[in-house]
Curated annotation (Swiss-Prot):
This is Response regulator PleD. The record marks R178 as: Allosteric product binding, non-activate state. The modification 4-aspartylphosphate is found at D53. Residues 4-120, 155-269 form the Response regulatory domain. The record marks R313 as: Allosteric product binding, active state. It catalyses: 2 GTP = 3',3'-c-di-GMP + 2 diphosphate. The record marks D362, R390 as: Allosteric product binding, activate and inactive state. Its cofactor is Mg(2+). It comes from Caulobacter vibrioides (strain NA1000 / CB15N) (Caulobacter crescentus).
Length: 454
């Protein structure tokens, strides 16, 4: 996974070392030797991640980080502060400045690439969310999901047989999050399938294999996307590498530093929240794309795609497909007499009656205006005619109540019915025959059903 990384340090040897390591892993690297240059490059180039040394003359890393986070152009870019080994105060100040994470000198390669990979994935989600929100603003849709999702605590499952360590982690997280401790990996798997935002697992647990537990989470559909942080001893490089290979999102080096814990937990929970929002938003967008907003039925676009595949299957020897084309009688008169708001009420009520009188396998759609279509898979013409007659009677049998009960309208419909005719038939021909049936039904006085054989 490649990314564009800006490395900022006033010591050239440090810059060149990081540049060489990152370039060898196919990252695109740019460099700056001071704060003002870094700010200008960040605003101009919009890198994916910024690695920023704390101790720089003139403008230190904290000031640079604050300025990046104050600028709407760059505030979304994750910043990793590079601190001294004993820099607890630096990490506290870094969090206050808006840093996403930390690296400690001397920089360990495994931790460097774990941090970069984790934040690169996070940045991809941020970019997608920002793009969706920009599109929403252009379309006049209320945006601001990222702001609403930020700052929300999460439910964190701590899987650890070291009770003292688990309690310490839970105490650190308890102010902002809702930690739950589980020492039994089998019970933890069940818990992970529930409303959990993050799992923290002891990769070096004595009574169970933490890496095997993580692999099991990744193999299950319901927990595959769940973020996992692994607690690993800093000198256990083999376990670190293996944890990352099997799908751990990031590493927590023991003993656990409270600021690093806070930063890493925040990043993973934010990423999950953003991803869940995007996934739900996509599902909603897909639903909107195939749904008529007035009636709640499928729209013409969706109907066309489904009809194409059903007719193709029928012409290749499958069961017949029938189509009902329905037109509300004198609908223009309803609009002209009572207004378009009442007309919309009639359309919504008709859609409810239509949907309640077709089978689960049928596809009722709004075709346009006052025209509706029902696609009926595996249905011969005679069966479709019976269903069409039932719909007609259900519509005409009782008045439509509109205008909050102040008006009662008698509504009737004309229905044309057709069915596929075997090899050579097309969706267009099927609907054309149904349309001819509607024309004949109206010519005969309306409130009628007419079938049209091929």
């Amino acid at each position: 996974m490649s990314a564009r990384i800006l490395v900022v340090d006033d010591i050239e040897a440090n810059v060149r070392l990081l540049e060489a390591k990152l370039t060898a892993e196919y990252y695109e690297v740019s460099t700056a030797m001071d704060g003002p240059t870094a700010l200008a490059m960040a605003a101009r180039d919009l890198p994916d991640i910024i690695l920023l040394d704390v101790m720089m003359p003139g403008m230190d890393g904290f000031t640079v980080c604050r300025k990046l986070k104050d600028d709407p152009t760059t505030r979304h870019i994750p910043v990793v502060l590079i601190t001294a080994l004993d820099g607890r105060g630096d990490r506290i100040q870094g969090l206050e400045s808006g840093a996403s994470d930390f690296l400690t000198k001397p920089i360990d390669d495994v931790m460097l690439f774990a941090r970069v990979r984790s934040l690169t994935r996070f940045k991809l989600v941020i970019d997608e969310l920002r793009q969706r929100e920009a599109s929403g603003r252009r379309m006049g849709v209320i945006a601001g999901a990222a702001a609403r999702l930020d700052g929300l605590g999460g439910r964190v499952l701590i899987v650890d047989d070291n009770e003292r360590q688990a309690q310490r982690v839970a105490a650190e997280l308890g102010v902002e999050h809702r930690p739950v401790i589980e020492s039994d990996p089998e019970k933890a798997k069940i818990s992970a399938g529930g409303p959990v935002d993050l799992v923290i697992v002891n990769a070096a647990a004595k009574n169970f294999d933490g890496l095997r537990f993580t692999a099991a989470l990744r193999s299950e559909e319901r927990t595959r996307q769940l973020p996992v942080l692994a607690m690993v001893d800093p000198d256990d490089r083999g376990r670190m590498v293996k944890a990352l290979e099997i799908g751990v999102n990031d590493i927590l080096s023991r003993p656990i530093d409270p600021q690093e814990l806070s930063a890493r937990v925040k990043t993973q929970i934010q990423r999950k929240r953003y991803t869940d929002y995007l996934r739900n938003n996509l599902d909603h967008s897909l639903e909107l794309a195939v749904t008529d907003q007035l009636t709640g039925l499928h729209n013409r676009r969706y109907m066309t795609g489904q009809l194409d595949s059903l007719v193709k299957r029928a012409t290749l020897g499958g069961d017949p497909v029938s189509a009902l084309l329905i037109d509300i009688d004198f609908f223009k008169k309803i609009n002209d007499t009572f207004g378009h708001d009442i007309g919309d009420e009639v359309l919504r009520e008709f859609a409810l009656r239509l949907a309640s009188n077709v089978r689960a396998i049928d596809l009722p759609c709004r075709y346009g205006g006052e025209e509706f279509v029902v696609i009926m898979p595996d249905t011969a013409l005679a069966d479709a005619l019976r269903i069409a007659e039932r719909i007609r009677m259900h519509v005409s049998g009782s008045p439509f109540t509109v205008a909050h009960g102040r008006e009662m309208l008698n509504v009737t419909i004309s229905i044309g019915v057709s069915a596929t005719a075997g090899e050579g038939d097309t969706p267009e021909a099927l609907l054309k025959r149904a349309d001819e049936g509607v024309y004949q039904a109206k010519a005969s006085g309306r409130n009628a059903v007419v079938g049209k054989a091929a």
